[in-house]
Amino acid sequence: MTELRNVEAELSRFRARVLVAGLAVLCAFSLLAARLVYLQVYRHADLSERAESNRTAIMPIVPNRGLIMDRNGIILASNYSAYTLEITPSKVENLDETIAALQPLVEITSRDKRRFRRLREESKSFESLPIRTRLTDQEVARFAAQRFRFPGVELKARLFRSYPYGELAGHVVGYIGRINQTEKDAIEENDDEGNYRGTDYIGKLGIEQSFEAQLHGITGVEQMETSAAGRAVRRLASNPATPGETVMLSLDIGLQKLVEDMFGTRRGALVALNPKTGEVLAFVSKPAFDPNLFVDGIDQESWQALNESIDKPLLNRALRGTYPPGSTYKPFMAMAALQTGVRSSKVLINDPGFYMFGGRRFGSPENERGGIMDMHRAIVESSNVYFYSLANELGVEAIHDFMAPLGFGQITGIDINGEVRGILPNQDWKRHYFKRPEQQRWFAGETISLGIGQGYNSFTMLQLAQATATLANNGIRHKPHLAMATQNPLTQAIQPLPADPPVDLGYSPENVAIVRKALVGVTQEGTSTKVFAGAPYLSGGKTGTAQAVTIGQKEKYNKARMEERQRDHAVYMAFAPADNPTIALAVIVENAGWGAGVAAPIARRVFDYVLLGKYPSEEDMLAVQKGVAIAPIGQPRLVSDMMAQLIAGNAAMKQPAAEAAAPAASAASAAAAAASVCQGCLRVVPVTLKKRQSRSSGSVR
């Protein structure tokens, strides 16, 4: 009986254990089933999306940057594609060892390493950074064969910007560079991060900066299937990028080259405008720089050479260099007298070679005695005494109020950034400019110097050119602009850029005629007669000599005894043809002396180019560069021939090892269309476009 009870007890315990185990298994399976239902039903959509995202990746498609062209369709900025070797620091265990291992496959210079270190300091560790750009085909092949050895290192096809004419118009075209933190913040503020995904570059200067929105394009996206290692396997879907628009400039690159060549190694600036439209035909600052240096990130040596150069090649003298206008100010002083009624053109003033005011003697060059002067003769012969007395009669406030609407000391609003205001002085300006009370008072004697464009006067060549164009256009002022139109790269549709309405300053036609006649007299019987001898057209102009340093009352200017950078600047303002001007300009050659001897010859060759289609002979070009030219010498060359050489020379340059990204057909189409939007075009040079493969101020007073 005892054994039977024990067996029954064991069986009872066993059944209890089986029941507990069964219940435990049932609970476990219930929990698993519940979890399965939860994952498969309630979380199905979310988990499916996560799984799909692990299998696929959304990649940005960087748009082709738009082209930049001159008024005749010549390409000034384009793109080409090339392979770049890039490293993502967060995916590499030892950067130094990786770079060392790469060097037998790909040439990596010390400059490449320095740039990589700088980019790494400026960027986040998960961003891919270029260690070498523009790989050769052989380097691409060598790395591709060894790619498995280098996790975190990739070959990427990138678009690169190219400026085929180098320094030519570099200050106008500008350049692109890597996006810095300030620019990233601005992009985020504008909610434009999506459009810059996959993009490392942005316009930094010139047209590249001002028209960034048009040139950049719209970033596309593509959905890619990826492997477990995260590499793209195949494209699942795509929304293509929209290329940037082509920006068409009013600039004539042939004229630009002519002027830059005439400057040679000298410093200075020239701005040429169409007075009827405000289009900028030439915008020269010398010396210049090559924007190609900045595309990949300029190296330290090149940066120091540019930034520390005494000649300041990075300074856009046409936009930011300020100078006294010298005697080129006199025609505008004459207009002020006529328009305000302070003095008529027939009033006679005796010029004994000096002007006495407040016990101080204001002299003329070499104390020349001009004799009896009316307004016409005073402009033609550039009488200082006449305009000393006129400034005294007008007073500083009247001078200021008349000159401001002409654009002197004002921002013109040209369509590139960085313009400076300069100084158009009056009593209020002096009170704000100087801190010490005894310096804030305006003295009557300070007004006298303003009459001949000296004293506190300090303007840009852009302002002087705009004022000259306004006078040439009968007192109607146009806003200067470099860009004329944009072209859609897909539809080829051209959209002219809206221009500000012209401003009529209300000048009397009779008064304008008096001053313009005197300016024509300067070229026919005055200070620039020899320079314009033999010209088959009439032009108006005014020579000027602007002081770089102030000469004491009892001192005499002696060029031979002065340091080169203390010598006077040569200035000239002009327009042509005289009866119906289509071009107006202002030019300065720093520390070169008399305007008639150095600056006016440059203007003459510009007019011959625009009006006659003539390019200086080699001997004439050399004479201009040396500052000894007067009228042209030798057999002039044809502009069309020189343009053909310019384009052929560019095509023969060493090209990058890649095809141009911009289609040749698009470039040719834009070139053909360029002339149709050149309102007021002076001429269109016939060219055939070929597919391209790849000092804070200008002076110290």
Q: Predicted segments — roles?
A:
Residues 586-589, 602:
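C-terminal soluble interaction/assembly domains
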Residues 177, 381, 590:
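Cofactor-binding loop segments of dinucleotide-utilizing enzymes, especially the Rossmann-like FAD-
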Residues 1-302, 310, 322, 347, ...:
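Periplasmic/cell-envelope proteins involved in peptidoglycan metabolism and beta-lactam response
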Residues 41, 69, 515, 586-587:
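Structured catalytic/translocation cores of nucleotide/phosphate-coupled proteins
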